[in-house]
Amino acid sequence: MVRATGSVASRSRRKRVLKQAKGFWGDRKGHFRQSRSSVMRAMAFNYMHRKDRKGDFRSLWITRLSVASRIHGLSYSRLINGLKQAGIHLNRKMLSEMAIHDPQGFAVVATQAKLALEAAVQG
């Protein structure tokens, strides 16, 4: 009986890993054993940073909103509080896009937030 080898599967597995290691430097690019560990590490970082990206964008939106709200005489936290009291349900991404691309519209929203805050203080 002929000895069964896994050569086709092994070759395709090695090829896949070496293809993923394209662009790596030195032995990490062409030697399977080092490529495999480098690719695994790269994939771990990739997974981790995909999760981090969500928080990074949220921080960016908050920074943009903070700057835009200070132009209208509000801090970021007072802007968000005023929007909640005014019943305006816009998320931070949409608000930051509005602050950049539609400053007049953002000014209207900020004014409504300010009025809601003043109404809460008086009443």
From Swiss-Prot:
SUPFAM superfamilies cross-referenced by the UniProt entry: Ribosomal protein L20
User: Which Pfam families did the record assign?
Assistant: Ribosomal_L20 (PF00453)
What keywords does the record list, in alphabetical order?
Answer: Ribonucleoprotein, Ribosomal protein, RNA-binding, rRNA-binding
Q: Does Phosphoprotein show up as a keyword for this record?
A: no
| Range of residues in the leader sequence | none
Highest taxon above the source species: Bacteria
- CDD domains, per database record: Ribosomal_L20
Q: Which GO terms describe its molecular function?
A: rRNA binding; structural constituent of ribosome
**Which InterPro entries did the record assign?**
Ribosomal_bL20, RIBOSOMAL_L20_CS, Ribosomal_protein_bL20_C
Assigned GO CC terms: cytosolic large ribosomal subunit
Q: What does this protein do?
A: Binds directly to 23S ribosomal RNA and is necessary for the in vitro assembly process of the 50S ribosomal subunit. It is not involved in the protein synthesizing functions of that subunit.
Q: Which HAMAP family match?
A: Ribosomal_bL20
Q: What is this protein called?
A: Large ribosomal subunit protein bL20
